[in-house]
A protein has these predicted regions:
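Conserved glycine-rich Rossmann-like NAD(P)H-binding loop of the short-chain dehydrogenase/reductase
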Residues: 31-57
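A short, exposed helix-loop element centered on a Lys and neighboring polar residues
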Residues: 134-135
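Residue(s) in the substrate-gating loop at a strand-loop-helix junction
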Residues: 154
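Substrate-binding pocket helix/loop in short-chain dehydrogenase/reductase
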Residues: 110-111, 118-123
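Active-site loop-to-helix junction immediately N-terminal to the catalytic Tyr of the SDR YXXXK motif
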Residues: 106, 114, 160-166
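Canonical Rossmann dinucleotide-binding motif of NAD(H)/NADP(H)-dependent dehydrogenases/reductases
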Residues: 2-38
């Protein structure tokens, strides 16, 4: 039996990329998934995000693996959408064993060209977002006296990159 058998994983930024890959990997190991993603275009940055169609496809793929998947469209910056998703997860699964804070953005700009709005969006999603989600999940983990929190980040935290002023 896998260490993840019958665990419930709440994953932000789950619609594509690392979030999607993690959701599928955990489902293959026996975990049920709460897939949380903004599932729409946001104001910054200028690249694509997960879509509601991608969330639906992820749900189908997780269920094809014999696991349950709750999809929740929401923004990690919005306490109400996070609270609603956590409440739905608890109502559906009764617990959250794993929190994978994966949602994040990157603003491609040099410091002299980055706008305040780009900076604020990046800080709010990459720093405040994990705080908001963790704050809403932790009470359930504390009640269960069990839980794992993983905060994902970028290799850019270890070394700089071209046009990455953060």
């Amino acid at each position: 039996m896998s260490d993840f058998e019958n665990k419930v994983a709440f994953i932000t930024g789950a619609a594509h990329g690392q979030g999607r890959a993690t959701a599928l990997a955990l489902a293959k190991e026996g975990a049920d998934i709460v897939a949380f993603d903004v599932a729409k275009k946001i104001e910054y940055p200028a690249y694509s995000f997960g879509t509601s169609d991608e969330l639906k496809r992820l749900k189908e793929e997780v269920e094809a693996l014999g696991r349950r998947c709750l999809i929740a469209a929401g923004d990690v910056r919005d306490d109400k959408s996070v609270t609603d998703a956590v409440d739905r997860a608890i109502a559906e699964f009764g617990k959250i064993d794993i929190l994978f804070n994966n949602a994040g953005i990157c603003a491609y700009a040099t410091v002299d060209k980055m706008t305040d709005e780009e900076w604020d969006a990046m800080i709010d999603i990459n720093l405040k977002g994990p705080f908001i989600v963790t704050r809403r999940v932790v009470p359930h983990m504390m009640e269960a006296k069990s839980g794992v929190i993983i905060n994902n980040s970028s290799v850019m935290g270890l070394r700089g990159g071209n046009r990455l002023s953060h």
